[in-house]
Every structure is written in C-alpha cells, then in structure tokens.
Amino acid sequence: MIDSLDLVIDSIFAREVLDSRGNPTVEAEVLLEGGAKGRAIVPSGASTGAYEAHELRDGGTRYMGKGVLRVVEHIEDRIAPSLCGLSASDQVNVDQIMRELDGTENKENLGANAILAVSIATARSAANAFGMPLYRYLGNPMSSLLPVPLMNVINGGAHAANNLDFQEFMLVPHGAESFREALRMGAEVFHTLKKLLSDKGLSTAVGDEGGFAPDLENNNAAGDLLVQAIEKAGFRPGEEISLALDVASTEFFKNGLYHFGEGKFSSEKMVEELKKLVNLYPIISIEDGLSEDDWSGWELLTKELGNKVQLVGDDLFVTNTKRLRQGIDRSIANSILIKVNQIGTLTETLEAIDLSHRMGYTSIISHRSGETEDTTIADLAVATRAGQIKTGSLSRSERVAKYNQLLRIEDQLGAQAVYAGSVGLGPRGLSK
C-alpha cells in the first residue's frame, strides 16, 4: 500500500529540447516526495487548426523565433510553486489549477505546451509511484484493446515538399488478428511501396511523418500506388488493408473555395470529389475532408458519406468538447481526432474522448508532425479503448517508438490483449 505522502509533488523542472524537425520543444519532469518521477515532452504540429490551444514561443532570432525558454520559465517559476505540495494522483485538480493560473480559454498566458508537459509528467509520476504502466493507471482493468494503426505512408500537403494536395495517404491493416500482425502487414506494404517508387524513378525520401513524399501527378496516382503495393505485398485491398485520407482541406480553403489540383471547388463539388474517391478506392476514413469553418459543407459531407466511411474532425474539433458538442448537435462527422496538445491538459483530453464515445463517435489518438521519443499516446490509446491510433509511417524512430510501445503493451497484456480490428472495431466502413 502506497503512503499518500509519497504522491506529494516535491519539485518540477523543465528544459528546452528538440523535436523531430529540429525545432525546440519543452520537456518537464515532476518529482514526488516518495522518489518517483515522471517525464513528458510536448509535440508540435505543422498544419494547426485555428481553434487549437496556444503554443507559446519566444520569438526573436534565437532558434528563428521558435525557442521555448519562456515556457521553461513559466513551468519553473509559476506552475511549480502552485503545484508543489499537491497530490500527483489528483490529476483533475492539478490540471484545473494550471488552467486557473493561466486564466485564458486557449492557454495563451502560460502556453498550452507548458501546461501539457506538466500535466502528462504528473500522470507519469503518479503511475510510477503506484508501480503501474501508464495505460493501466489512466485506464482500468478492462483496458486491453490494442488500436488499429492508421499508417501514413505517402505524405503531401504541409508535411512534404511535393505537389500532392492531400496531406496523408494511410494504410489501415484492420484485417490482422493482433497488433503485432498489423504492424508486420503495414511494414511489408511500406517496403513494397518503396520498391515500386524506386522502380518508377520516383523519390523515396520521406516527409515529416516518415512516409514517402514523391512527386505524383495527382491524388488518384497516390491511391493507385497504394492499392498496387497492397496487392504486390500479398494482401487484399479493402478486406485486409484499407485506405484512409487526411485531406487537411483547411490548408487549401480560401475565400470560400477549395483550391487543389488545377481547380477551385465549392463545398458541394468538394463533397462530390470525395465521393468519387470513395467509389474508386477502398477508403474507410477521411479526415478533415472540409475546412474547419465550413459547417454547412460538413453537414452535406456527413449526409452523403457518413454511413459509408469514418469522417474525422481534426481542425474541425481540435480535441475540444465545446466544438465537439456543436458538431454532435448539427450531426457533423462521426469521429474525432485526439491530439493532446490541441487542448493542453490530460484531463480535457480524456473528457473529449469520453464525450465522443458516449455520443457514438469514434476516436483516434494522434501524434503531431513535430514529434519526439515520448510514447504517451500509445498508452493513451489503450487506456481509453480508443480502438485507433495515428502515429505516422514505418520509418523515423519518433514514429516507430509508439508502435514499439504498443508491442510491449500487447506482450504485457498477454492473453487479455484484443486487437480492435479483429473484433470489428476501429474505423467505420469496414463492412462496406
């Protein structure tokens, strides 16, 4: 039995470290009276929604304005004095105190990156004090569901310097019997795709999230390549491995029109384009198919495709329960992407996941394009029984770190482990 005094926060430290793009981010450490400690590093996005919590940067010339020394200062000089002496096991209280200390809705005073680093480090310190893995501490004895991975193997948009408008083209190995098998299937298609690209004289350089970033004629060419790679690797498209898209359409939405390819599309035309893709390819999930502010367009998209595929709100919902409730009230989308740094605390993240599940929406735990070796989201996916995780391709160690953590969790769970795809969970559209 652990002594309650062992859970008391003794000290909090922070440091400036680098993310996978070589940009600064913040790492926090929380030390408890009993000797346990927790550490967390915050990721950073490239294509960020306008309604995300505020990521604080230093400005100036150092690190081209992207330094986070002010964030470090806020953690050590303002947050630490307010939290030391409190119990690390009272996550809700810890997060609420930081939110009140900041005093703004989007956390612009202290910075969501400051608050989130401490929030996750606190949870990790408590889990370590109890001698529990993070997924068990945040979850419950029933938390044994391993997520279906959405593997970003072709990068475009803001994540790559190529001519693809859509940001991510993903493999979804839902037909596997275990997470380990799903990872193998994805890796085999990834390497098959690399050879196909090489044989065609196309680049096999990778983008921010570890996927290939070739210059292809259009989005359809990416779909064709993926289907070909799946088949050549020995799998059945649509039965064992399907496709998912992150359109990231806010990035090319200007003056009420969607600018991509050689055209300019209204919301109605954009919906028609997405319907064509769903009919052409084994697509079961579309993320941010329309812009974050195009609510009427989203209503149409959901009406047309909501019963066929998973429609995911990322920039649309930004892991925010207020925006998610608005979407639910208007019957918009049927899934939410969960990014911890979009909202800035672990408590609010868990609230968004809980709301989505209670209202019949699926949830996908997601990385950011600027990632680190921190594997919290792998544990979070299992803890919340989310059923899906999006953490990049099968290359770059900051992406693979999450997959490897899920392999460890699957081993720890043993016979209890259940792969979401094997029991018909995961993205909508698997039965189409």
Swiss-Prot record:
Cofactor note: Binds a second Mg(2+) ion via substrate during catalysis.
The reaction(s) this protein catalyses: (2R)-2-phosphoglycerate = phosphoenolpyruvate + H2O
GO cellular component terms, semicolon-separated: cell surface; extracellular region; phosphopyruvate hydratase complex
Family (UniProt): Belongs to the enolase family.
InterPro entries documented for this protein: Enolase, Enolase-like_C_sf, Enolase-like_N, Enolase_C, Enolase_CS, Enolase_N
A Pfam entry, by short name: Enolase_N
Any one GO molecular function term: magnesium ion binding
Binding site for Mg(2+): 246, 287, 314
Superkingdom field: Bacteria
Residues annotated as catalytic: 209, 339
Organism: Prochlorococcus marinus (strain SARG / CCMP1375 / SS120)
Keywords: Cytoplasm, Glycolysis, Lyase, Magnesium, Metal-binding, Secreted
Binding of (2R)-2-phosphoglycerate, residues: 167, 339, 368-369, 390
The EC number(s) this enzyme carries: 4.2.1.11
SMART domains in alphabetical order: Enolase_C (SM01192), Enolase_N (SM01193)
Enzyme kind, highest EC tier: lyase
Full protein name: Enolase
Organism lineage: Bacteria, Bacillati, Cyanobacteriota, Cyanophyceae, Synechococcales
UniProt KW Metal-binding keyword: yes
Biological role: Catalyzes the reversible conversion of 2-phosphoglycerate (2-PG) into phosphoenolpyruvate (PEP). It is essential for the degradation of carbohydrates via glycolysis.
Disulfide pattern: none
The keyword Lyase is assigned to this record: yes
HAMAP family, per database record: Enolase
